[in-house]
A protein has these predicted regions:
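Catalytic cores of the polymerase beta-like nucleotidyltransferase superfamily
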Residues: 1-380
Length: 380
């Protein structure tokens, strides 16, 4: 946007403002010094919690379509309502959002995401058609199919509930750090984004969404790239949480074993606490007995994670024999055989089949190498 700047009056300036609450002025001249200039009743709108445009909203939004995003953002951040005529104009002008750069839209989306209750913003975005232009993948979650009298839940409203649960957890002692709080909200928004592409009907099970976590994780990179969100560690963090978000739930649905928790901690690494927060937020079942069972099992998972952390899980879960030693021992270059042997040792440690000590791991390594036709003397 490159507006033409011209000299003008205060009235001209106020007419160009996006919303009445931003069109307030204080007189600095003469005997009117300090007087509030409020030609559009902006103070009243502030008091009543209303977002409205000073002039015809179609003109206001046409002048700068990003104002539609700002309208939703202010309503979300301030918990205000959008004035009916202004709200209707959002739908009429939604298509003009296409001329706005992805970076500017992403900036507004991040501000909506960081609001106390971002789901309010997504209600406005969805109902006005703006969301379809920004995140059509999210709109697909609002499609509910019924077959043989069996319908799956509305995954769009479930997603917003999970997002609100994550926001509510921000005040808890185990909440994520300020640096990651925005991105765990994005992970909550995208945690089920792969469900429409994975949806299948089974005559026995009904609707299934197998592998939706992996499909969704792959979608994250494409969405971040399109939305001009950062393609760095932040994106990978969101990807990881989306990919792993079913793991704690699967563990909590059965007997919580040491092996499963060790593998989970190994895969999640330093993001294990954020993953657990997201997964607990994902339990939105209306069946209180089932919900209580999940939460109790999550408590057990957290206890086992805490125990691993106290015992320095990074050292415990990383085999003391590494790839360099394997290559040197068997006179091998970097190759598939080295990777296979490393994985054998890793699995044994994660499953607690052998202690992470040199002697028992060496015995296991030699046994596997012999079956692969490898020897210390000759290598391959």
């Amino acid at each position: 946007r490159k507006p033409v700047v011209e000299n003008g009056t205060l009235e001209d300036d106020q007419n160009r403002r996006d919303f009445t609450i931003n069109a307030l002025a204080v007189c600095l001249n003469g005997d009117r010094f300090g007087q509030l200039v409020d030609p559009f009743d902006g103070i009243r709108d502030l008091e009543e919690g209303i977002i409205a445009t000073p002039l015809d909203p179609d003109i206001t939004f046409s002048d700068d379509p990003l104002r539609m995003m700002r309208c939703v953002r202010f309503a979300t951040q301030l918990n205000f309502d959008i004035e009916p005529a202004t709200y209707d104009a959002l739908s009429r002008n939604a298509r003009r959002l296409k001329i706005i750069s992805g970076e500017r839209i992403a900036d507004e989306m991040n501000k909506i995401m960081l609001a106390p209750h971002p789901s309010k913003g997504f209600y406005y975005l969805h109902e006005t058609g703006l969301l379809y232009l920004i995140l059509p993948e999210l709109c697909q979650l609002d499609i509910v199919e019924t077959r043989n009298g069996r319908a799956h839940k509305n995954n769009y409203y479930h997603t917003l509930e999970v997002l609100e649960n994550v926001c509510r957890a921000a005040s808890a002692p185990d909440c994520p750090s300020p640096e990651t709080h925005l991105w765990i909200r994005w992970a909550a928004l995208f945690h089920d984004i792969g469900k429409p592409r994975s949806k299948r009907w089974d005559n026995v099970q009904g609707w299934t969404f197998h592998n939706h976590n992996n499909i969704g994780a792959r979608m994250v990179a494409d969405i971040f790239r399109r939305m001009k969100l950062p393609m760095d560690a932040k994106m990978k963090y969101v990807q990881k949480l989306v990919e792993l978000h079913m793991r704690p739930i699967a563990i909590a649905d059965e007997e919580v074993t040491d092996s499963a928790v060790r593998r989970l901690v190994n895969d999640a690494g330093d993001d294990i606490d954020d993953l657990m927060l997201l997964c607990e937020a994902d339990i939105t079942s209306k069946n209180q007995v089932r919900k209580a069972r999940f939460l109790e099992n999550f408590r057990i998972v957290r206890e086992k994670i805490a125990d691993l952390r106290e015992r320095d899980y990074k050292r415990l879960l990383q085999p003391v024999i590494d790839g360099n030693e394997i290559m040197e021992m068997f006179h091998l270059p970097p190759c598939r055989e080295v990777g296979t042997l490393k994985q054998v040792l890793k699995n044994a440690v994660l499953d607690n089949e052998v202690p992470n000590e040199r002697e028992p791991l060496m015995v296991l390594l030699m046994q596997k190498a012999a079956r692969m036709g490898l020897s210390v003397e000759t290598g391959g």
